């Protein structure tokens, strides 16, 4: 799979913003 790096960053940014 894909590494949960982009997902983590995107999820955090989405929750914060």
From Swiss-Prot:
Is rRNA-binding one of the keywords?
Answer: no
Q: Which GO terms describe its biological process?
A: tricarboxylic acid cycle
What highest taxon heads this organism's lineage? Bacteria
Q: Which UniProt keywords apply?
A: NAD, Oxidoreductase, Tricarboxylic acid cycle
UniProt keyword NAD present: yes
This entry's Gene Ontology molecular function terms read: L-malate dehydrogenase (NAD+) activity
Q: What does this protein do?
A: Catalyzes the reversible oxidation of malate to oxaloacetate.
- Report the protein name in the record: Malate dehydrogenase
Q: What is the lineage of its organism?
A: Bacteria, Pseudomonadati, Pseudomonadota, Betaproteobacteria, Burkholderiales
